[in-house]
Each structure stands twice: as structure tokens, then as C-alpha cells.
Amino acid sequence: MTMPDLHPLNASLIPLLGTWVGPGEGAYPTIASFSYEETLVFSHVGKPFLALQQRTVERVSGAPLHAESGYLRPQGDDTVEVVLSQPSGVAEIHVGRVDETEAGVEIDVSSVGVHTAPSAKLVRETRRRYVVEGDTLTCDFWMAAMGEPLTHHLTSVLTRRT
């Protein structure tokens, strides 16, 4: 099967394409700090979006921790929408900016809607930032959940594998 041509609206997101792997750290007022290993894959099918698949495992044991999947939907200017779903019962819709840089791209999005399944923990707000500089991707995540205000929760520094 041949790879379809990249849709022109995805041009600013090209630096994200590929598989990224690396360590991360998490902290939040209601839990103990922790470390993890993250794998993040950005791909395309020739349509005006990139697909995102993410998973994390405990760094020492390899036990699964988290997973999510979704789409980055560039809007033709410097705006991007990000739609994500998690098996924990959380669905997020974000809007934000894509800024092309000399070294890659910076994406900063904030939630315009967070919905939770009846059995999921209540998450009220989220923010995500992805910064590509060459073959390094730095990811940061903030959330307002469990009665806490918007607080930095996760950071990972990933290296491009493919």
C-alpha cells in the first residue's frame, strides 16, 4: 500500500509526523509523583488532519498506565483543533495555535470542552503544548480535576524513532 500525499492543510504539522519515544514525569496535588515511558505516534491518511496515538507505561515494570487517541485538525490559518479520547472515559476538544519555528513547530491548545463518562473522574479543563525542535518533541499537559485548579500535570521529552 502506498502512502497517500499529505493534505496541504497539514503542511505546518509535518514536523510532528512519526513515532516518538521517551521518558516523562507526572505530578499533581492529589497523587504521588511518578515516572513513565511514553510512545506517541502522529500519522496521516491524506485527509486534512493528523491522527495521534499515545500510550504510557511505568518506566521500571512496563505496566500500562495511560492511553489516548485522537486527531489534530488544522484550520488553514494558525489555528488547530485537537480532539482526543481516553479509555478512562474522558473526551477533550481543544482549540489553539500552531506556530512554525526555525527548528520545527509549537502547538499550544486549551480545552473548549471536556466531557466525562459517568464512571470517570471529573476533569473540568485541560491544556496541552507540543514543541518540536529537530528530532526532540517536548509535551506538557495541564488539567483542572478533582477540585484542583488548572495545574501542570505531565511533561515528557521524546526522541523521534521514525
Label for each model-derived stretch:
Residues P87, G113-T116, D135-L137, M143-M146:
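Short acidic/polar capping segments at secondary-structure boundaries
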Residues M1-F49, R55-P64, E133-D135, W142-T162:
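Amphipathic/hydrophobic helical signal segments and adjacent flexible N-terminal regions
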Residues R59-D99:
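Helix-adjacent hinge/juxtasegments
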Residues G22-Y36, V83-V95, V109:
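N-terminal short leaders/motifs
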